Amino acid sequence: MSRRVRRKLEEEKGKDKVVVLPSYPETSISNEEDLVAPELLHGFVDWISLPYDTVLQLFTCLNYRDRASLASTCKTWRCLGASSCLWTSLDLRPHKFDASMAASLASRCVNLHYLRFRGVESADSLIHLKARNLIEVSGDYCKKITDATLSMIVARHEALESLQLGPDFCERITSDAIKAVAFCCPKLKKLRLSGIRDVTSEAIEALAKHCPQLNDLGFLDCLNIDEEALGKVVSVRYLSVAGTSNIKWSIASNNWDKLPKLTGLDVSRTDIGPTAVSRFLTSSQSLKVLCALNCHVLEEDESLISYNRFKGKVLLALFTNVFDGLASIFADNTKKPKDIFAYWRELMKTTKDKTINDFIHWIEWIISHTLLRTAECNPEGLDDFWLNEGAALLLNLMQSSQEDVQERSATGLATFVVVDDENASIDCGRAEAVMKDGGIRLLLELAKSWREGLQSEAAKAIANLSVNANIAKSVAEEGGIKILAGLAKSMNRLVAEEAAGGLWNLSVGEEHKNAIAQAGGVKALVDLIFRWPNGCDGVLERAAGALANLAADDKCSMEVAKAGGVHALVMLARNCKYEGVQEQAARALANLAAHGDSNNNNAAVGQEAGALEALVQLTKSPHEGVRQEAAGALWNLSFDDKNRESISVAGGVEALVALAQSCSNASTGLQERAAGALWGLSVSEANSVAIGREGGVPPLIALARSEAEDVHETAAGALWNLAFNPGNALRIVEEGGVPALVHLCSSSVSKMARFMAALALAYMFDGRMDEYALMIGTSSSESTSKNISLDGARNMALKHIEAFVLSFIDPHIFESPVVSSTPTMLAQVTERARIQEAGHLRCSGAEIGRFVTMLRNPDSTLKACAAFALLQFTIPGGRHAMHHVSLMQNGGESRFLRSAAASAKTPREAKIFTKILLRNLEHHQAESSI
């Protein structure tokens, strides 16, 4: 696979640790000299003399890790870096946060107000921060958090005003913990919990009694809630039960419509019907907005389509226009509906009305949450919504002042375009809608944020969208390659992982490969492998996948090797146990080794300690993709003479024969590479004999019968090499290989497959196999071991070899009694006979000698076949033509060829091909003498 898309970030082990420096007391400005600007001292800037407030402002623009790095430069800046004003908020999500780390940070967290964390280990460690003044706590991946942990957190932080856990389900939290929240946090204003099984009346009534300021309440994706008790939380202004099941809507509408302050109600993704919706919109005196997005029961009923009969109330649903509904909240007809979010943001800058700000923030939050949840489950029938409204809503919400809304919207964009995660398939229409509305530029701006959470989600969206070639081009034109290459250098694993995914998808395009290398992307990707070699499979798979794509380019492959990529990829192939990483590492090594003589990467991979052994082991993987790429790598590496023998020593013959035997029902890609690797190894006579001895002939014959052109072509090549050995030739006959090769020779759409099948048959019946059969005691007319008639097989083979050769000759040439040998005629014959791909075949001296000897064979068909083969191997322009000509000249074959061309006993086909062969030799001789 050459690219990857991701729907949702998953919690992984091995998070990088927070860099913590010793705590120093805050310093004060003692005199005015400390406020002077940096001065030039001997040509250098004295950065220490920067005003303290300027340095503090600089610190605020950096993430925690960069703050720590900057603070390590000198004692003065260490003191400033520890200032409590820099530690009012803390995002622990990208880091491994445990009790010891919390204790190290505690002295800085006296004034900590806002905290975001991820996972149960971080939750258990929060109390060790001793941040008694915490106002807001937000956690995700909380499925393992228990009542005890949550109760302990709220008991130590009585000043909490906001608590959010989700969007994943809090499976182990019960109503007992909710009661603890109510008892311990009397100042609570906002509570949003996801995925709780049962929210009892006692828990809700405790909130109503002990949290008089609670105005924003959300029980999302819960199984059961007490509808009547919710009607007693009279302080609530904004209520969300999105995704919650088993709600009795008759009870809910009879109780919630009496809530005196209820301004916004979110019932998205529930089974609410039109009756309850009408009741809320007509009975509630305070309600302004009812959000009912993706409510299938409501959408199946057309009675509410003309929802504008509810004067002063706004219904947001899939059958309404969300932008129009939001715009109607403010009676300003001068604004275009799609500009409503921008209008709101300007309004929030100028207004001091906290109620309006809270209202707008709540709407942004619930819409972003519902859009993400809807994108994750990707229900059918929403294409029109996504194209006309959904994409634009997500892009608008990405510009929110709320960081979590921005992140969720970017994640929504990354998710809603994906059709199939495994096959890296996206919906082109949705992707184009994002690009049309300026989404690429917005995402790239978000990726440049100093906030690592935004960087990560924006990079993920860019990566998924870049599966589309047009969007990949737009990303490159907007400077996205440089941005992603920069993010790939991040010390935050989540950011680096998503950036590597973006480079992986962008590197599919040939036009982007060099740009990635020039932006430093190759080195960044290699460094990622060394930075997180263990336990970070997502990073490693994406880095290896991107390097695999880049290694397919000759120039970039040299950059990969120069950056240490060979060692890094071999390390992954040897040590990593995750199949996705193994597959991409093997593919990268295969591509590095695929450039032949244009660079020395093939030899370099083979010389890397443990490389060949690792690839041989990977051919035994239970995962088909790993086996396929490992076999492909061994195939490419086998073109190097030393590698070929080293692969054999590493057990490659046995492993690849076993692979070929087991892949009869596998994908064509695996079959092609298994046969190809055996083809490459069988160039060596010793390997050829070993392959035959290990049982490699039957599976290759089976693969030669494949309908897939690529498969039977590589199988024909392997059988051609094996047939050079008379023992293997006899095995091929005994195993029923002659009919398979005859079928290829006559019926394959691949000229190369037909050619190599004909050559294999010629090897088998040029007389050497008969001598071998006599030597081992088998009659020349019958093979007793398999009861196969050699004479019958020979006749069948020669008949089809002749038909194959004649298919490359214009029959009109032989109409006249005397065949012309003019240069024009010979050129015409050459043009018709040439098999372009045959120029890539490289024969040994023994093989060339065998074809020359075959010209002396009494059989006219074999003579013609030998001349035809030598013609193909020496045509000017062929990759190895000069090599073949040199072998023939060194063997002194020219005199014999002239004799054969002039002999009246030579068949006309062979005579013409021999004359062309002589002309080829003369051409190369003249060329080499210049």
Curated annotation (Swiss-Prot):
Tissue expression from the record: Expressed ubiquitously, with higher levels in root tip, pericycle and vasculature.
Cellular localisation: Nucleus
Keywords: Nucleus, Repeat
Primary localization class, coarse: nucleus
Top-level taxon: Eukaryota
Gene Ontology annotations for the cellular component aspect, listed alphabetically: nucleus
Subunit organization: Interacts with SNL1. Interacts with MYB53, MYB92 and MYB93.
Function: Promotes lateral root initiation and development, independently of auxin (IAA) and abscisis acid (ABA).
The protein, known as: Protein ARABIDILLO 1
Lineage summary: Eukaryota, Viridiplantae, Streptophyta, Embryophyta, Tracheophyta
The gene coding this protein: FBX5
